[in-house]
Amino acid sequence: MRFEGRVALVSGAASGIGRATALRLAREGASLGALDRNEAGLSQTLREIEALGGKGAVFPCDVSESGAVARAVTASERALGPVDVLANVAGIGDTAGAEGIEDLHDERWALVLAVNLTGPFLLCRAVLPGMAERGRGAVVNVSSLAGRSKSANAGPAYSASKAGLLGLTRHLAYDYGRRGVRVNAICPGGVDTPMIRAAGVSQAPSPEEAELRRKRIEAYRYFMPIPRLSSPEEQAAAIAFLASDEASYINGVALDVNGGLYMA
């Protein structure tokens, strides 16, 4: 197994790509530290890890808060050992400003950047020095097609946060590559997750909102070269590859996992 004897820390592990990544890495032998604000979702992820025969621990954490991140990483390393793999998956979608930047308020801009960009920065800052000291490690950041171009559904805060994450990825890849640590990113497009299904509709959607949701998901097949949404597991497979020794000479890359929606 590719991650036997290694410790992986995954943010956003309560659902979607984060949960799929946690399960994939645990299935391949990693001891898994799972971070998220959603404690019920974390508990479910842990149950699924244990059902696989894996080892895991959960650490409720708001990744946008410096102190919370420091405490969570310390607790994880105390429970599982030093972090060998970090997957920064936690993120929030946002439609504010999608129709015009005048609709994007200061507070929403700050929140989206805090979760999607500051969160990965805080986690990288917490684990990279230890990885460098040990001379090995891998970080995979989940950016987005929106960071490459723009989002068809989200607003400018989301696009800016994901573009910034690509810049952070490249900078850290250069700084830490010579110390045995690789830093890469993936750029998903449409992924069948709770976040994309909830975009633009309320928690208890009306029949009209439910129909809007159905039409949005259906629309992907008309403009994507591979005419469907990705599964979270397909994204997790890409993350696992970049984190593994099979990708030992891949560093500073933004891997498009979006069905050909963005072609560079």
Please tell me what each predicted stretch does.
Residues 124, 161, 169:
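Active-site helix of classical SDR
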Residues 144:
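Residue(s) in the substrate-gating loop at a strand-loop-helix junction
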Residues 97-101, 105-110, 220:
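Substrate-binding pocket helix/loop in short-chain dehydrogenase/reductase
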Residues 177, 182, 250-252:
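Short, small/polar-rich loop/turn modules that mediate ligand/substrate recognition or access, typified
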Residues 98, 240, 251-264:
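Short C-terminal tail/terminal secondary-structure segment
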Residues 129, 174-175, 248:
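Alpha-helical segment proximal to the catalytic Tyr-Lys
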Residues 3-33:
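Canonical Rossmann dinucleotide-binding motif of NAD(H)/NADP(H)-dependent dehydrogenases/reductases
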